[in-house]
Regions:
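Central helical "cap/lid" subdomain
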Residues: 1-52, 116
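Conserved flavin/dinucleotide-binding core of flavoenzymes
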Residues: 14, 31, 36, 51-194
Length: 194
């Protein structure tokens, strides 16, 4: 048995198949895109927002962050807030310079948590759209109407090729639990063929 890792099950259109996939499976693969998501993190000396009785959690419809969380490790240092920039905001955010992106995030965190947010000791960002093996995040999204036509092929093996990934889950699609259960399903299918 040979296993290989490729992009998410729906997002395998950067992989060359020989022989080529059957028509309906190939059409499904071509019609699965990814969401646009960037993860940002600001690191502070300490989680100062807790001293103000704040949780470090924020939800916003503004720009750029749509949701932020306190991601500080146990204890009192460092303080870490991470957030997600998604959809249209992520595409707009990507057009800014690195300094402009950092400034936009810090300005929004300052609105949430006050002046202590103005001077993080570090700042990180990851654009999942720029990652070779994901090309986006958080989950594969079929084009409008394509799932009704090609969806039945999503979990169907192609010869010895079995599909697994959160997009192929029958429950908890889009979550880690779905990814695990789909991996178990695909493994059981492959074992049954031995």
């Amino acid at each position: 048995m040979v296993g290989t890792r490729c992009r998410q099950a729906g997002q395998s259109n950067g992989v060359a198949y020989d022989p080529i996939l059957p028509c309906e499976r190939d059409q499904l693969t071509q019609r699965y895109g990814q969401g646009t998501l960037t993860k940002v993190a600001a690191v502070y000396e300490r989680p100062f927002w807790r001293e103000q009785g704040l949780t470090g959690f924020a939800v916003d419809t503004g720009f750029p962050i749509s949701i932020a969380y306190d991601d500080s490790p146990p204890g009192s240092r460092p303080g870490v807030v991470f957030g997600f920039v998604g959809g249209d905001n992520a595409r707009r955010y990507a057009r800014l310079s690195p300094g402009g992106r950092r400034s936009a995030v810090i300005a929004q965190l300052t609105q949430y948590f006050g002046p202590g947010a103005r001077h993080p000791k570090d700042f990180f960002e990851t654009s999942w759209s720029q990652e070779e093996w994901t090309r986006g995040c958080p989950v594969g999204i079929p084009a409008v109407g394509s799932f009704a036509t090609y969806g039945p092929r999503l979990r169907e093996p192609v010869g010895r090729l079995h599909w697994a990934g959160t997009e192929t889950a029958t429950f908890w699609n889009g979550y880690m639990d779905g990814a695990v259960s789909s991996g178990e399903r695909a493994a059981a299918e492959a074992i049954a063929e031995l």
